[in-house]
Curated annotation (Swiss-Prot):
GO biological process, one term: protein transport
Residue span, EF-hand domain: 25-60, 61-96, 98-133, 134-167
Species in which this protein is naturally found: Mus musculus (Mouse)
Name of this chain's protein: Centrin-3
SUPFAM superfamilies (UniProt xref): EF-hand
Name of the gene this protein is made from: Cetn3
Bridged cysteine pairs (disulfide): none
Binding-site list for Ca(2+) 1: D38, D40, D42, E49
Lineage top rank: taxon: Eukaryota
GO molecular function, one term: calcium ion binding
List of residues that carry Phosphoserine: S135
Function: Plays a fundamental role in microtubule-organizing center structure and function. As a component of the TREX-2 complex, involved in the export of mRNAs to the cytoplasm through the nuclear pores.
Length: 167
């Protein structure tokens, strides 16, 4: 599967054995989210900016979570946190993510019709959303390459194998 999503989610088994660290891409995503949602460009983010930045990074944060982060990290009582604090919080949260759970979330992004499988239609939609200009022939070839049970679609088990490199 040549879509960008695969590259972001492939689980590196050697890293799981060592202390996990963020990739350069993940570090850049954190920086970009902070800069994008620091709307007043004061090098700190408030409650609303923090909540939106966390959501942009894939976290479904509750009001209580955001308030706790602000309480724990707002040392100057400004109602805001700095990039350094944001980076510390988000890095911890990212490293606590379960890679298997992230793969299942990605599968659900493809399987928007809840069929339990990724069809040609699902794959075509995702490719289009990612700006990939791929023909149906190319998309079918991708499915065929990983479709171990030969049903013309990618089921959850096959998707997990793709994403973990257990093909």
């Amino acid at each position: 599967m040549s879509l960008a999503l695969r590259g972001e989610l492939v689980v590196d088994k050697t890293k799981r054995k060592k202390r996990r660290e963020l990739s350069e891409e993940q570090k850049q995503e954190i920086k970009d989210a902070f800069e994008l949602f620091d709307t007043d460009k004061d090098q700190a983010i408030d409650y609303h900016e923090l909540k939106v930045a966390m959501r942009a990074l894939g976290f479904d944060v509750k009001k209580a979570d955001v308030l706790k982060i602000l309480k724990d990290y707002d040392r100057e009582a400004t109602g805001k946190i700095t990039f350094e604090d944001f980076n510390e919080v988000v890095t911890d949260w990212i490293l606590e993510r379960d890679p298997h759970e992230e793969i299942l979330k990605a599968f659900k992004l493809f399987d928007d019709d809840d069929s339990g499988k990724i069809s040609l239609r699902n794959l075509r939609r995702v490719a289009r959303e990612l700006g990939e200009n791929m023909s149906d022939e190319e998309l079918r070839a991708m499915i065929e390459e990983f479709d171990k049970d030969g049903d013309g679609e990618i089921n959850q088990e096959e998707f997990i194998a793709i994403m973990t490199g257990d093909i």
